[in-house]
Amino acid sequence: MQSERRRKILEIVQETGGRSVTELCEQFDVSEMTIRRDLRDLDREGLLRKVHGGAVSNLGRSYEPPYAVRTTRNDEKKRAIGRMAASLVEDGDSLALDVGTTTLEIAHALQGKRNLTILTASLPIANEIVANLSLTTEVRLILTGGIVRSGELSMIGSIAARTYSDFHVDKAFIGVGGISLDAGLTEYNLEDAMVKKPMIQNAQQRIVVADSSKVGRTTFTAVAPLTVANTLITDSDIDRTMVNALEDLGIEVMIAKEGD
């Protein structure tokens, strides 16, 4: 009962942009204390923003849910995307693995690959590689360096961007905040976007990995036009008209199915 009410509260706030405690009490016929507790817990999960007297949606273009929250969202879809992306990696490849929860799933799925060089600005990805792959026979790991972004465990700043500028890789696996026909590839954070740009520029093959919730969305800052992408790997919930539009631009769309 509680979880269903909170799910509906979240839907209402996201659809309308915001609701007062009084309005939600009337709609669900519960006490103010109950609604305030629901809003507090939803805020702690990063699903909405609690304000004085109510709550507002956090789906603005500059708001990105915390990393710890994103790791629990669409996790089965992300795992499927990660497996499909890893299947494109060949022994001997040099890779750039972007920061993010979907690219982390690629690192999970790289076991069995040999003689890889992996460049990343992500501490969770580096930790995954160190823990589960042999750095002597299978992987050479390069961290970009830079300033660690609090809460994200990723590296940003001129050092990180310059490192990507100094290396040319076979394949870059790119995570983004949004993919739209009008705005192209976009991100929530300007500093993240500045690090992604040289990574994309210096990759021979550019593979965007994003669950379908990112498709059709525009976030805060531009990263690159859509046409830089050779491939998009996403899940089966993507709108078919968007698939057709992307393919018309020459972008291969690969659908990762859960359980494959």
Predicted regions and their residues:
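Short glycine/proline- and acidic residue-enriched helix-loop micro-motifs
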Residues: 64-72, 143-145
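A residue-level structural signature of the nucleotidyltransferase/glycosyltransferase Rossmann-like core
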Residues: 117-118, 171
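Minor-groove-contacting beta-hairpin "wing" of winged helix-turn-helix DNA-binding domains
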Residues: 53-60
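Conserved phosphate- and dinucleotide-binding cores of soluble alpha/beta proteins
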Residues: 4-24, 29-32, 43-44, 50, ...
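Helix-turn-helix/homeodomain-like alpha-helical modules used for DNA recognition
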Residues: 69-112, 118-120
